[in-house]
A protein has these predicted regions:
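Charge-biased low-complexity segments
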Residues: 25-241
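Bacterial N-terminal signal peptides that target proteins for export
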Residues: 2-15
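C-terminal motif of bacterial Sec signal peptides marking the signal peptidase cleavage site
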Residues: 21-23
Length: 241
């Protein structure tokens, strides 16, 4: 039995201005010091937070503590998903937007190669269920965090396909996908394709918060598509729509 997650880095990137994604498997990124301004900075744990900008800072240690608590929940999501999708495994990165009450009101998948919407939704629910540190000096705190999971099941990994391997299907998919998305933004899709050319499972990372509501529609479009057969063993492929 493989270890459920290869490594989960708790060096969370706390965003003060422009969000930067912490790449999966990379070393923890040090948090940049807050820019000097003429306005006095409020105390970290103050109950009366001074709102000076849209994006505020977060207590790094407190955020790391939340991620330590959610590890088991995220792992359980993958385990449950692997009961349905035998070859489930991969990387996933989240965006968590935290309001002044410490609630994760804006949580979504930023990128993922898990290839299972149900598992990704389970993970989002885990992150939303936790209380987070309140942002300081802004209306909203932003966290970007990446995780990596090995396949829970003792199985041969799927055949790795590139987008070129499904080029014919993608040409037919774009028009139907646009009906879901309105033609706005680029959605990152990962799917497992069985030996008959049907999608076993599909996961999607939307381009922004508004795109989250369109993901389920897009998943159904891909599931109903016909792909070429990968041969005698299922394939895994990532592409954009």
């Amino acid at each position: 039995m493989h270890t459920m997650y290869r490594s989960i880095h708790l060096g969370t990137l706390l965003v003060l201005s422009v969000p930067t994604l912490l790449a999966c498997g990379s070393r923890p990124v040090e948090v940049a010091a807050a820019p000097t301004t003429k306005q006095a900075q409020p105390k970290r744990e103050s109950d009366s937070i001074v709102v000076s900008s849209e994006v505020g800072g977060l207590d790094e240690d407190a955020v790391n503590g939340v991620f330590e608590k959610v590890q088991s929940g995220l792992t359980n999501c993958v385990r449950k998903g692997a009961r349905r999708v035998e070859l489930l495994g991969g990387d996933v990165a989240f965006f968590v937007g935290i309001n002044l009450s410490g609630q994760a009101e804006d949580t979504r998948v930023e990128r993922s190669t898990l290839g299972d919407r149900e598992t990704e939704s389970c993970m989002i629910a885990v992150l939303k269920s936790r209380s987070w540190p309140k942002p300081v000096g802004g209306r909203k705190g932003q966290v970007h965090k990446a995780f990596s999971f090995d396949m829970p099941n003792e199985a041969r990994p799927p055949v790795e396909w590139s987008a070129d391997d499904v080029e014919d299907t993608l040409r037919k998919l774009h028009r139907r996908a646009d009906k879901c998305t309105g033609g706005s933004g680029t959605y990152q899709v990962t799917a497992y394709i069985d030996t008959r050319g049907s999608a076993i499972s599909v996961g999607v990372a939307p381009p922004d918060t508004s795109g989250e509501a369109k993901v389920d529609c897009l998943v159904e479009v891909v599931k109903n598509a016909k792909f070429k057969s990968p041969g005698s063993y299922p394939a895994k492929v990532s592409f954009e729509l």
